From Swiss-Prot:
It comes from the Bacteria. It is a multi-pass membrane protein. This is Flotillin-like protein FloA. Homooligomerizes. The chain crosses the membrane at residues 1-21, 26-46.
Length: 328
């Protein structure tokens, strides 16, 4: 019985130790003590109860202690609970300390929570980044299109990382400055001869205000000539004027044709009236003969005049037909 009790007690002790080691990261606690970081078992148990991974807090704390940073467990745990990347912020603080950059932990944590890569920002502060723009097109005063590509050397401004705009704003502002500088040039050869004038003009405008970067230099990498926009516009204007003139000429021709048809209709109307009047002549002549107002001699003279008039009209029509059929 005594031996059985010892076995039961031993099993209970083993189970208790297993539960303890599974709930309390004793290995991590030993590592912290060995590194000179004072962390109590109660602190680790409290992290477990607050659903904080002790390894993601104590590991960066050991790293910060070895680097000489004065950080506390509460600072790292608070940043972890806020959804931040504790390890990255600590690495950024270590890199900033090595580069003699003033970066308090609170500012680094705020930058990390804002969605910025704080470690990359510190590295960019030490090693400036080169941003290359696509070809930016502008038109000089003489109508020649000029294309320019620029390389922008920027350094991260840690004090403006929270709330400052990014690379897209830098590229857009530099592009606007290049277009404005090219457009103010009287001749495109001025841009080709002195491309550094673009850099000086754009750099003097303070384009990095309100951004998360500080522009160190703007270098024109390539300049190319595009289309003759002025000539193209003149050609298009001439073509438009031609089309307008043709449209007006067609309108005048249509009006002339309509007027001609109207005149022909009026001629036919007048001829109808003449025929109507001629149809009344025999009746009037018969009435005149009955009443003695017209003699037989007068009647035959009138007939001769009508025959003579008909012959002249026939000759005139034949002459007009011959003139129309003759080659021009």
């Amino acid at each position: 019985m005594f031996g059985l009790g010892i076995i039961v007690i031993a099993v209970i002790i083993v189970i208790a130790l297993l539960v303890l080691f599974s709930f309390v990261p004793v290995g991590l606690w030993i590592s912290a003590i060995a590194a000179g970081v004072k962390v109590g078992i109660g602190t680790l148990v409290g992290m477990r109860l607050r659903r904080v991974s002790p390894r993601k807090v104590i590991g960066p704390l050991i790293k910060a202690h070895k680097a000489g940073l004065n950080l506390t467990t509460n600072q790292l745990e608070s940043h972890y609970l806020a959804g931040g990347n504790v390890d990255r912020v600590v690495d950024a603080n270590i890199a900033a300390q090595r580069a003699d950059i003033n970066l308090p932990f609170e500012r680094g944590a705020a930058i990390d929570l804002a969605g910025r890569d704080v470690l990359e920002a510190v590295q960019m502060s030490v090693n400036p980044k080169v941003i290359e723009t696509p070809f930016i097109t502008g038109v000089a005063m003489n109508g020649i299109e000029v294309k320019a590509k620029a390389r922008i050397t920027v350094r991260a401004n840690i004090s403006r990382l929270v709330g400052g705009s990014g690379e897209e704003t830098i590229i857009a502002r530099v592009g606007e400055g290049i277009v404005s500088t090219i457009g103010s040039s009287e001749h495109h050869t001025q841009v080709l001869e002195n491309p550094d004038n673009i850099s000086k003009t754009v750099l003097s405008k303070g384009l990095d205000s309100g951004t998360a970067f500080e522009i160190l230099s703007i270098d024109i990498a390539d300049v190319d000539i595009g289309k003759n926009i002025g000539a193209d516009l003149q050609t298009e204007q001439a073509l438009a004027d031609k089309n307008i003139a043709q449209a007006k000429a067609e309108e005048r021709r249509a009006m002339a044709v309509a007027s001609e048809q109207e005149m022909k209709a009026r001629v036919q109307e007048m001829r109808a009236k003449v025929v109507e009047a001629e149809s009344e002549v025999p009746l009037a002549m018969a009435e005149a003969l009955r009443e003695g107002n017209l003699g037989v001699k007068d009647y035959y003279n009138l007939k001769n005049v009508e025959a003579d008039t008909g012959m002249r009209n026939a000759i005139n029509k034949r002459t007009e037909q011959n003139e129309d059929e003759s080659p021009k």
